[in-house]
Amino acid sequence: MKINITENIKISMRGYTIINVNAYWEENGRRYAVKACDGLKIDSNDKEVILRGSYDGRNVEWKLCNKGNYITAELTIQSKNEVYIDALCAFRGEIKPEEANQKFLKVPFDNDDWVKFESKEYSKSEMGYGVSAVYNQNGALIIGALEYDIWKTGIIPNECIEVRSGVTDKLTRDTIKHGMVHGEIVKSPVIYIGESRTWQQGMMGFADIYNEYNTRLLWHGPIPFGWNSWYAYMKEIDMDKYMEASKFVSKTNFYDKNVSYINFDAFWNVGLTSEELLKAAEFVKERGQIPGAYIAPFAGWIKEDCIDDYVTYDTGERVRVDGF
């Protein structure tokens, strides 16, 4: 893998060449390209290329590091005063495959709503989330974010492929724009651009590097086995159906270390009274199972006029999230 800075930054990989590589950030609804910064300087060696410049009191640094069979890219905006950044793109470039017929592997943001991985012709593809792949018979290009603690990142397969941090849409389960990230220093996630013989091998390689950047959350309990009401009953769940499921599971080997979960999915708060919920939970416990319900801080179906019945309080004040 080579990074050539004499031709407006070109990256050569297995089966692919990426030309006109650039980066940008968005602020107050406007886009600013790194290469358009004032006083732009380029420092380079065999291992990395660093572009530094400034714009309107902001110091801008864009770093590309050659790691052998993959490259990392990172964009940093720094100012004496806080900056408010809408989005960052630490990698954008025009892909030139040695062979045509390249495809794009779209990776979904999550597994909700029966969403699937999709592989289509590059020109007919849509944004992937977190990590995606461009591939043909000669090789694969894996592009993704190695960090997810601040930004939601999408891989956009346009004429120039770009890795945009600050994406939201219906497939990220958002109905509002990505929030601005602010501070005296605002960084993009570290972006991974790797090559491989196949996209399958490439994804395994990406996972290995991802694990170097992120600590796995270890689970010390038994393997979670259980039953969930949605597939069988959807919104028709009631106490009798739930208890029958508990009986069935108790007669099978669907458990690990004698632990299994019997879970209510959505509509449990409609199909059962409070008394029925308590009775069902006790029924499950008597069989050595653990009862559960589908609810989370960010998955609530609460009517506005009932909000005060559900919110939590801290030191006597109602806890607010994002101003609500």
Pin down the residues of each PLM region:
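Generic recognition of stable, solvent-exposed alpha-helical segments in well-folded globular domains
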Residues: 201, 240-244, 272-279, 294
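Active-site-adjacent "subsite" loops/lids of carbohydrate-active enzymes
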Residues: 292-324
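Carbohydrate-recognition beta-sandwich/jelly-roll modules
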Residues: 1-256, 287-290
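A short acidic (Asp/Glu
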Residues: 86, 272-275, 304-305
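Surface-exposed amphipathic alpha-helices with a cationic face
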Residues: 250, 277-292, 296
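The substrate-binding groove and active-site-proximal loops of carbohydrate-active enzymes
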Residues: 223-240, 260-274, 319-324
